[in-house]
Amino acid sequence: MTEDACRIDVWLWRARFFKTRSLAARVVEEGGVRLVRGQSRGPVDKPSRAVRCGDVLTFAQGPKWVVVRVEAFGERRGPATEARALYNVLNEAGATQRTQTPGA
């Protein structure tokens, strides 16, 4: 990948949303992650899909939906404080209950 993009499974793992990269890849393959980039939006089904700064991702974390904007890529899976700099949370601390698929 180029410096202005990162694989979605790698980014989700580096941002510490998933414990392993393979778990992040599985969730992506199962259609559990939605991507919004400009006017383009929809589910992501390939872990190799590139994310760019400014992209908005929606995915489930336990019983709640998480909506984040990608701010940076990072170079490693660092501590939580380092990972937190990779994104901005757009919903209020996961306040959206997971009762239905967002956008459905």
Predicted regions located by residue number:
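Strongly charged
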Residues: 2-10, 14, 26, 34-104
